[in-house]
Amino acid sequence: MTIPATGRIVRNGSGQDIVIERTFRAPIADVWESIVDPERMNRWVGTWSGDAGTGKRVSFTMTAEEGATPEEVLIHGCDAPKRLDVESFQGETSWRMKLDLSESDGITTLVFSQNVEVSDEGASSYGPGWEYYLDRLVATHEGTSFASWDDYYPAQVPFWEEELRKAGTRESS
């Protein structure tokens, strides 16, 4: 089974972002805890340790992937329960990610964004990766099982390649 991609590439002042939205039939505070509490994060993506706070660094490990190594994450901003702004470092590479939450009538919307470098050859795999992890987050809230990674990758790569092309970061193949 292939899971359709739902995200998009949006140009910004410094390049472009992967943007993916998810909705939850849950209060904003509950969804917020799922993205900041190490134990609850571990259910869908990974866990972190350290002294968290704006301007501080924590160690984050993705637990849904075999052999994942801890990476350093700088917390640029945290406005609970509405916004988390972090930067993840792997060697000389870094990714800025933002999670914005809003609630209306008991429905919480999460908007995830991650910067994507024009020259990054792996950019078309980041979209499927975040679609996968954000769907895992939704599944933890709904009490449903997780789809397989194979339902996202490589099936979604053409969609994300086209998004990158439309944003002016890729030539037509």
Task: List the model feature ranges, each with a label.
Residues 17-20, 26, 38-74, 79-83, ...:
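Short beta-edge strand/loop motif at the mouth of beta-sheet-based domains
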Residues 28-29, 76-81, 101-109:
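A short, structured loop/turn motif at beta-sheet edges
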Residues 31, 41, 58, 75, ...:
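Hydrophobic pocket/interface hotspot
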